[in-house]
Structures are given as structure tokens and as C-alpha cells.
Amino acid sequence: MAVNGASSSGLIVSFGEMLIDFVPTVSGVSLAEAPGFLKAPGGAPANVAIAVTRLGGRSAFVGKLGDDEFGHMLAGILKTNGVQADGINFDKGARTALAFVTLRADGEREFMFYRNPSADMLLTPAELNLDLIRSAKVFHYGSISLIVEPCRAAHMKAMEVAKEAGALLSYDPNLRLPLWPSAEEAKKQIKSIWDSADVIKVSDVELEFLTGSNKIDDESAMSLWHPNLKLLLVTLGEKGCNYYTKKFHGTVGGFHVKTVDTTGAGDSFVGALLTKIVDDQTILADEARLKEVLRFSCACGAITTTKKGAIPALPTASEALTLLKGGA
């Protein structure tokens, strides 16, 4: 499957947070026991934006960074990776967000965040680049931007403007419970914008959280369905993903790779999916083509787990195709 050339493909605008992850140099130890940390750029919406450009698509990032060395470093990383940066604001009074990430021996993660408040939380509706948002064919976002005002109001305004301009709305809640005042508030706010999205991707863990069920099955997933939804995805880690549309549902298998760090795997998956559908949304109604796209997306997610950090591990289309052909 050829990826559209960057010049011809529609724009995918990603809204939300970008931060610095501090990742221990040794896996399987607590933060206190870690001998040292490597800094890695992160933040799910930013990861998605770079995943798109790495695959040959066009993307832009909308959000706020601290007017500090880390903030300007992150903006530079977006630009270096071909992401349009004219939706970025800098805050002189607040720092860029930081997260310390514990890598367990199996590559899964635990988080400790420093953001009280961080610059991303202070984005206001008046600071939004509305022309950029209106130019989006796909508008992608998470839920971390819903936690506090004024960022929540900016999120709602951006979504409304994108929807009015005809964009496909893509939602990956990206649950980070330590950032929320309570689990109840997280569930309430994540669900508060549920019915606006055209495409929703949740992980198996998020499915359990949102439904209150410990079953990862079709009945549980379909309890999250809403009438305007075009595609609901439940990612299953190395087992692939389940997909649901109005007309059909099924499973796409995953890839067995040597997992080092799962950071960014879901973002890589989403970026691949959006890159493939931005110029041809009829794929969402064609099961055979959708399965092909989801297999490609699963390959991208799998490759991302084979290296430390999200952005350095995001694959090119040729790397994903190599894995699809069994050459990796």
C-alpha cells in the first residue's frame, strides 16, 4: 500500500500536550533506584503528529509549551520532523511539562508527572490558530487537555471549529489517571466529548476502565458505541486490535517483536491509521481495505515498541512494510 506523497495528502492536525519524558537508563527499577535518566520528547498528540510525517503524511501540532529551553527544544523537534508548528504558543510564566517514566522489566510503564501548572494546561481559546484548525481534514486529540481550565475551553473550541469546517474527529483518550483529581472525574470528562468523535481508539485497559467490566469482548466494546461513530478501535497490545463499525466488526492480529519500551505504540498505531484514511474515508466502510490499513497500523505500533522512547522509534512506511512482509 503506497503512502500518499506529503504534497498531496490532507492535513492532520493534532491538539494537546507535548512534554519531556525522563526515562531511566535501567529497566525494571523504581524511580528512586534509577541510576540516571535520558530525556525523551513525548506527549501523545505530538507523537501522533510525528508518526504521520514519518509515514509521509502532513501534520500540524496545536498546543502550548513553556518559553524555556525544553519548550523550544520540543518545538524544534516538531519542525525537524516536518510537523507544521504555527499552532504552537509559548507561555512565559509556566514551564514545559515533565514526566518521569518507570520502565518495568516487560517494557510497560508507570508515570510521575511535574505539571502544576505546566504550560500546556494554560492554552486559552483566544490563542488558538483557528485558520490552521479549519484547514484540517482530520482533527486528533486526547483527554489530558480536558483536565483543567483554560485548556479545556480551548479544547472544546478547537473541536467545534474543526467539526464545523468538516474535519473527521479522531479521539484517543490516552488515560493517565495520576493527572486526574479522581477516577470518577476522569471517566466523566473522557465521556463528556465522546459523542463528537468520528473515530475512537481505546486500549484494552481503557475499555475496562470506561465500562467498569473486566471483559475485553464485543459486548463491552459496543457499550461505548454512539450513533455518529464511524470506527471504534480497541487495541490489544501484541495481540493486535478489534474494530467495530456500523456494518461489521472483527479482529486484526498483531506482531511478535522483542518489546523494549511500549511508549508511543498506540500513538504510532493512530498516526498510521489517520495517514491512510485522511484522503480516502471510504476505507472506513470497506472491511477488506480497513483490515489492510489496520494491519499496517499494528505493524507501526509493534515496531515502536522495539526501541526506547516514542519519537525515535516511530517507523517509516518502508520499515512497516518490511515487517508486514515478514522480513523483520
From Swiss-Prot:
GO terms for cellular component: cytosol. PROSITE patterns: PFKB_KINASES_1, PFKB_KINASES_2. Keywords: ATP-binding, Carbohydrate metabolism, Kinase, Nucleotide-binding, Transferase. The gene is FRK2. Belongs to the carbohydrate kinase PfkB family. This is Fructokinase-2. GO terms for biological process: fructose metabolic process; starch biosynthetic process. May play an important role in maintaining the flux of carbon towards starch formation.
